[in-house]
Amino acid sequence: MAAFDNPVFNKTLTPVAGAGPNFRATYYTSVTEFTHVCPRSLIDGERLGTSVGKVADPPRFTVDDRTVDMFSHDHGAWPMRMEHWPGTSAERRRDKNALRFHEFHVYDIIEAHETAQSCSAWLHPRFMETLRPSGTVVTLLGMSACGKRVAVHVYGQQPYFYAKKSEIDASIGISTPGELAHAMAASLRSAASRRSTFVEATAESFVIDVVQRRDIYYYESREEEYYRVKSCSAKYISFLCDNFCRGVKKYEGGIDATTRFAVDNELFTFGWYRFKPCAGAIQIRDVTRHSTSANVEVNCTVENLEVIRGRADWPDYKLLSFDIECKAGGANDLAFPTAERIEDVVIQISAVVSSLLTRRVEHEILFSLGTCQLPEDIADHVKVCECGSEFELLLCFMTFLKQFSPEFVTGYNILGFDWGFMYNKMVNIYGMRLDGYGKANAWGTFKVQDMPHSGRGKFRNVKINGIVNFDMFSIIYQKIKLCSYKLNSVAETVLGEKKHDLSYKDLPRLFALGPEERGKIGAYCLQDSRLATKLFFKLVPHMELSAVAQLACITLTRAVFDGQQVRVFTCLLQRARKIGVVLPEKSDRFTFSAHAAGDQDDGGRSVGYQGAKVLDPDVGFHVNPVMVFDFASLYPSIIQSNNLCYSTMTHNPAAIAHLEEGTDYLRVEVQGRVFFFVREHVRRSLLAELLTDWLNMRKALRAQIPLAATEDEKVLLDMQQIAIKVICNSVYGFTGVMNGMLPCLEVAATVTAIGRDMLLKTKQYIEENWREYSNIRERFFPAMAHEGVPQYSVAVIYGDTDSVFVSFKGVPVACLVASGDAMAAEITNALFRRPVKLECEKVFTKLLMIAKKKYIGVIHTGKMMMRGVDMVRKSNCRFVNDTAKALLNLVFYDEDVATAAASSALVDVSALPRGLSKLGARVREAHAALSSPALDVRDFVMTSELSKAPKYYASSKLAHLTVYRKKIARNEEPPQVKDRIEYVIIAPGQRIQGDPFREKETDLVSSLAEDPNWVTAHKLRLNADYYFSALLQTLSVTFNAVFGDAKTAHIVMRSFIPDTLRYPAAVRKILAENTKTLTPM
């Protein structure tokens, strides 16, 4: 073998020479030759360099001091859940009576394409009839109630589409289904040069009937005749939808077979099934005909199946948590490894297997490149599989994945790094086929794709048939707001555990030192898998997303990866099917946006209509109690109460000319455009029906939670009600996405317009009906003791989308808290149609109203709440945050300071109240701290998210981009998109000799940004002036409400640290006066 150390080598090697057990499987069970890549340190002890060569021996690995064949079934390194691996006794024919089962749970559904020719020798005639000449088979993957791993193949699912009969007949001059079948077959055969299978198309390839249906769009739509075109071949349907009679609108042709199977038959995509008795023959497949790694495979039709409603337990599915460690292998082994370079290798993979039923770890395995001696405290619990080359390491892990066959996989950032790195290595470097490494034995989905957002997304879309991936990084990123999403920070925050961290720069040194040091890497690798497992069982994402999958009638994998649009669409499809309504293919008939095709933001969200109204805030420090009223489920309730829907809307005044405005329909005008929605007694809204059913279901689930017998049952019920809430809140957004699956911007625009009107009506009602104390005392405060009329006043000081802030003077907080629900109910009953409901959310005892969507307050329980203010932003450093919070605590919890702050806006800034002296003392303390020589760099670290790839930024003059470029220049681990990049600002003129970063320092602050680790290592000075200015900036924005405006607030805060050299005479005079005022501190 040749030594290799060229860091830019990027050539794809000869594909691995190997094969599966038979023509029906593509996972490897034999390899005769492969490319051997390993670090030179494993051969001759040299730390640098990589050995690359060809090996004509079968791959092997060592476990328990035994060297075993990679594909043997009796090595004992891990359990063999896949019973029929070549050479095992289970591969022989078995007693079919022992294989029978009645009830089974489904966790995933996959699709396959079968032909009559390939199955004629063994497939039962009942199922052969469904393949003419080929067909789609829907396979339900799961586990039987008796513990068997099963695959149930459902034959006979025919994809189809609709088209208006009148339009098809006029387009091609026909009038019957038979004529249409012949025309379609001819169209397919004429395209046979492009698709060879089309040459077999005949009129018998289709089943066409005429049905009564109604288009979902517009009130004037009426039932009429539609052709429903069915075929065994999904390819036929897809081609015809796109190419046959292109001027004729097609309906529902893009619905996949799995969705059709579940929606049309009212079946689950996740949950329990049973076989119906006396519903037709089923067939247990012989082991030689298995197409998956399941231990029992059954053929049936949909008539054989029924769901078991109300059963919520889970079978004993297995969870695999894995993590990989890599190292660079070129001339500079301290560079960050990339999968595209052959010399950068995966050196270890940890695998921790747990039971979802018991939530206990059952097996721990470490796959190691080279020998590895784990520390004694964990060595007895871990199987170590030692491999001689990277290919053998990857193949060993993939063989484990196939043989053990876990249903669920987790890890930390496995979508952003681990899966992508291994996939690129296996496919692009070693030329491996991976389509047999999910549950399917061949031709299964195994995709690792970047999200198509122009470099804006970190997460990859990883879809492996029969394996559901939960990346705990992406789940925590979406659910929990943290300053850092590094695993050690997350573990400390969520689990209360600290991680022993190891820099990737330490890996080359430790790896080259030998088995004992490699054991330290192994312990670190295992630690990450264990923490990911704990995070998984802490947050139980599978519980919530499986509830979403079941409710939305989509697979669990789609619930994880495919966003909100598909969830609402399938629910709407279910409802539409029941009432004879059809959904068009990617409709362009939403006229409100017809003239605004380009009027959208980068995310595809339409901005062609005005957003929710925000009532201008009464900026200031409010010491009178402030009650916050909140509209419960505002947008869903607006859709329900106003009967908004595709099917209730019209732009045509003639369509509602016979109806009475107000009573029979709602007239809406948005930005000069007028449209109408009929009331529910004229036509019921599909969206409103869906929302009503969901919310009733959610209410019932929430009522069951306190009655649940076990904690697991409580968690499941809670996750189910959360799933319903998420989907309900998605309906408004579903209609408002211009490039979505079924857009209707009129609905979204009406929702926001009505929301604005509701805020204004609420404000008007409060200020007119509650203006006089005598009008509300008997209704709301009958027990309040008083003499005469108190100094009472009421004012709406802010309105924010679904909340209204009301200030009460002369009413005790306790009375407001006690009467809040009654006050909200009065407004609801007076103004709104049900189910719109106003609720009393909270009462602030003090409120600092800063600006729109920015406020800080203390609620009646004593807890401080913040929204939109600088000090709770992730980008601020700890020094600024801590100082700002300390000042806030003084303002809210010290009555002297609070009284002074409330009056500050009313007095001349040159004569501030003496009560503010405590603020001045704290600011001086912070200023003095910046002069200390013993500053902790971590207190001054700021972070900014790398929201997209650096090349997509309009300007590179940003602090976090400067640090990004410095890390690249220094061959350090490059931050990935969606990472938060840490940086500090250093004093100018501190260049380190030998620093490979060569950009010149400029006057811009961004050029002074530096990596905190580099600052610590080289003892660089921080920029004290910058940090004090940053503190003043934050305080100015936060306290502008106290002092009238941000400029005045800045002057006041700066006055606590007098510096006559930096200010003009007028400002120096103010500073001098304030210094005298604050002298008694």
Swiss-Prot record:
Function text: Replicates viral genomic DNA. The replication complex is composed of six viral proteins: the DNA polymerase, processivity factor, primase, primase-associated factor, helicase, and ssDNA-binding protein. Additionally, the polymerase contains an intrinsic ribonuclease H (RNase H) activity that specifically degrades RNA/DNA heteroduplexes or duplex DNA substrates in the 5' to 3' direction. Therefore, it can catalyze the excision of the RNA primers that initiate the synthesis of Okazaki fragments at a replication fork during viral DNA replication.
Any one of the GO CC terms: host cell nucleus
Protein name: DNA polymerase catalytic subunit
Pfam family, one: DNA_pol_B_exo1
PANTHER family: DNA POLYMERASE CATALYTIC SUBUNIT (PTHR10322), DNA POLYMERASE DELTA CATALYTIC SUBUNIT (PTHR10322:SF23)
Catalyzed reactions: DNA(n) + a 2'-deoxyribonucleoside 5'-triphosphate = DNA(n+1) + diphosphate; Endonucleolytic cleavage to 5'-phosphomonoester
Gene Ontology biological process terms, A to Z: DNA-templated DNA replication; viral DNA genome replication
SUPFAM superfamilies on file: DNA/RNA polymerases, Ribonuclease H-like
InterPro entries in alphabetical order: DNA-dir_DNA_pol_B, DNA-dir_DNA_pol_B_CS, DNA-dir_DNA_pol_B_exonuc, DNA-dir_DNA_pol_B_multi_dom, DNA/RNA_pol_sf, DNA_pol_B_thumb, DNA_pol_palm_dom_sf, DNA_pol_type-B
Coiled coil: none
Record note on quaternary structure: Forms a complex with the ssDNA-binding protein UL29, the DNA polymerase processivity factor, and the alkaline exonuclease. Interacts with the putative helicase-primase complex subunit UL8; this interaction may coordinate leading and lagging strand DNA synthesis at the replication fork.
Record keywords: DNA replication, DNA-binding, DNA-directed DNA polymerase, Endonuclease, Host nucleus, Hydrolase, Multifunctional enzyme, Nuclease, Nucleotidyltransferase, Transferase, Viral DNA replication
Gene Ontology MF annotations: DNA binding; DNA-directed DNA polymerase activity; nucleotide binding; RNA-DNA hybrid ribonuclease activity
Superkingdom of the source species: Viruses
Recorded family membership: Belongs to the DNA polymerase type-B family.
The protein's Enzyme Commission number: 2.7.7.7, 3.1.26.4
Organism: Psittacid herpesvirus 1 (isolate Amazon parrot/-/97-0001/1997) (PsHV-1)
Localisation per UniProt entry: Host nucleus
